[in-house]
């Protein structure tokens, strides 16, 4: 009888894309894969080709809100729905990637004595994973951190989709219309873009395009028409098809420091200048992610508070100067093969070679 696994995680792309990396590899090993998510979450849009089961999920907030009361009832309902689904499926394992949909699933699995493995992408665990730690047999960590549950924790890195690693440099250059005479700088700030990065790049664009061919993923509704005619500069809101070729064409990256993005850079061995989301706009996870990558020699960091035309140019020049050093450090990383590491832990846990 085939082994069976349930994946869960959602609410944001960061809680889904590592699962997307796992799905084809699990199927290749003959494992039956199911997904539990919400009806209106991004996971419902992104997950294809495997059975998808819907439950309710309520958000647990760290601050006072009237929605906290109604969401408690959603969590209770979701727990009951998850328990019913898991009782019917009887999987060998639940792999929970985080996001609030994973909480009722992990709790229900523990109640039914189904093993649970958590994966934490960020340097510090999000609230959903904190609520599931006691229910888990193992916790896969993207970062080499000390936690209160070290006996359960395993350093794995974060799973990255294999298709992102299979791009063609020449195809990427052709798509962008670059001739390869200059280093290619990839600039990205997530699906919504990063206005602070966009503004700094725009202010330095003349000098930057003298040194680099630039592909700039500016985010939804953030294109700058004034730059359309500029040589060695291509802007997009975002790229879906052919992103792997764009990655292959890039020599350097300028980016926020969300866990998914920086582990993609690590797997690609793409040196990056990271501008973490400031504490005023986050729980500080990007700051810690970036500091870790800089300490390991995988990237350089420029805080948003210090970001301007001059500091950006200087930091990118320094990144280019030390590019080969960073590539060597990334090549020696134990976290780079997050996909293989997590697959091995799952296989070991359910007895699949």
Label the predicted regions.
Residues 318, 335-353:
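C-terminal alpha-helical cap of glycosyltransferases
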Residues 2-10, 27-74, 305:
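Conserved nucleotide-sugar phosphate-binding/catalytic loop shared by glycosyltransferases and other
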Residues 20, 24, 41-50, 169-171, ...:
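Donor-nucleotide binding loops and adjacent catalytic segments primarily
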Residues 91-93, 236, 248-263, 270-271:
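Acidic donor-binding loop of glycosyltransferase active sites
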Residues 64-93, 111:
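An amphipathic, basic-hydrophobic alpha-helix
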Residues 4, 32, 110-170:
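Active-site-proximal region of nucleotide-activated glycan assembly enzymes
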Residues 324-336:
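A short, well-ordered alpha-helix in the C-terminal region of glycosyltransferases
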């Amino acid at each position: 009888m085939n082994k069976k696994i349930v994946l869960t995680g959602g609410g944001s792309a960061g809680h889904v894309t590592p699962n997307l990396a796992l799905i084809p590899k699990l199927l290749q090993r003959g494992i039956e894969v199911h997904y539990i998510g919400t009806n209106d979450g991004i996971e419902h849009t992104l997950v294809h080709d495997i059975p998808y089961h819907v439950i309710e999920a309520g958000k647990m907030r760290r601050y006072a809100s009237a929605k906290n009361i109604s969401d408690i009832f959603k969590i209770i309902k979701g727990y009951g729905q998850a328990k019913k689904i898991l009782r019917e499926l009887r999987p060998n394992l639940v792999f929970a990637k985080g996001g609030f949909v994973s909480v009722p699933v992990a709790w229900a699995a523990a109640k039914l004595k189904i093993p649970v493995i958590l994966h934490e992408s960020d340097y510090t665990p999000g609230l959903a994973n904190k609520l599931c730690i006691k229910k888990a047999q193992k916790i896969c960590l993207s970062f080499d951190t000390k936690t209160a549950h070290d006996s359960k924790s395993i350093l794995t890195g974060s799973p990255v989709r294999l298709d992102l690693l299979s791009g063609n440099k020449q195809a990427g250059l052709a798509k962008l219309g670059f001739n390869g005479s200059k280093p290619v700088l990839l600039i990205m700030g997530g699906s919504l873009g990063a206005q602070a990065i966009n503004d700094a790049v725009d202010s330095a664009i003349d000098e930057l395009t003298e040194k680099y061919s630039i592909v700039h993923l500016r985010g939804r509704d953030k294109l700058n028409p004034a730059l359309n005619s500029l040589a060695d500069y291509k802007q997009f809101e975002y790229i879906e098809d052919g992103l792997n070729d764009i990655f292959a064409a890039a020599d350097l990256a300028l980016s926020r420091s969300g866990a998914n993005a920086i582990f993609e850079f690590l797997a690609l061995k793409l040196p990056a200048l990271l501008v973490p989301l400031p504490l005023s706009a986050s729980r500080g996870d990007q700051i810690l992610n970036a500091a870790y990558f800089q300490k390991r020699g995988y990237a350089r960091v420029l805080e948003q508070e210090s970001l301007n035309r001059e500091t950006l140019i200087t930091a990118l020049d320094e990144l280019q100067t030390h590019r080969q050093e960073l590539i060597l450090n990334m090549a020696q990383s134990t976290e780079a093969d997050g996909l293989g590491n997590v697959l091995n832990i799952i296989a070991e846990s359910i007895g699949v070679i």
